[in-house]
From Swiss-Prot:
Main location: membrane
Superkingdom of source: Bacteria
Cell compartment(s), UniProt: Cell membrane
PANTHER family: MEMBRANE PROTEIN INSERTION EFFICIENCY FACTOR-RELATED
HAMAP family found in the cross-reference section: UPF0161_YidD
Function: Could be involved in insertion of integral membrane proteins into the membrane.
UniProt KW keywords: Cell membrane, Membrane
Protein name per Swiss-Prot or TrEMBL: Putative membrane protein insertion efficiency factor
InterPro entries, sorted: Membr_insert_effic_factor_YidD
SMART domains: Haemolytic
Organism of this sequence: Bacillus pumilus (strain SAFR-032)
Keyword S-adenosyl-L-methionine: no
Amino acid sequence: MKQIFIGIIRFYQKCISPLTPPSCRFYPTCSNYGLEAIKTHGALKGGWLTIKRILKCHPLHPGGIDPVPPKKEK
């Protein structure tokens, strides 16, 4: 499942993103955030963090630096 999500994001980065002007308000970009979140937290939690991030990426949000939260140790 994790590899499927990573593949979808990579496809977006290589095939769709170059066709549109840069518009992400955050650093790292939403797609890079998604890759890092899924690699760090797995498909379920990383996917959820990515969805939350994409929903924040709009003209009314100031944007800025928003790193992936570190994985909590148990």
